[in-house]
Amino acid sequence: MSHNHDHNHDHEVISLVDEQGNETLFEILLTIDGREEFGKNYVLLVPAGAEEDADGEIEIQAYSFTENEDGTEGDLQPIPEDSDAEWDMIEEVFNSFIDEN
């Protein structure tokens, strides 16, 4: 299984708006090209400025996304919890990313 990923974002920041209209800034940790296997890309996000907790962990959110035709912005969608194949691929790429850093 081969998936391209990019982690040279120099801490690109995006904002997400929740159901209550609250805007939260996130840093892009990693993008994954899953188009060949799943027909979409993925992005892993961490809250902007977040630090590890007492256990050395940090909250990471994963979304699938589709870029606009001009390569800018796009739609983020939650990844279905029951999509084991997608989650397995994301976990594999993330673990490789951690091992490289």
Swiss-Prot record:
It holds the Pfam family DUF1292. NCBIfam families: PRK13678.1-2, PRK13678.1-4. HAMAP family: UPF0473 (MF_01448). Belongs to the UPF0473 family. This is UPF0473 protein str1961. It comes from Streptococcus thermophilus (strain CNRZ 1066).
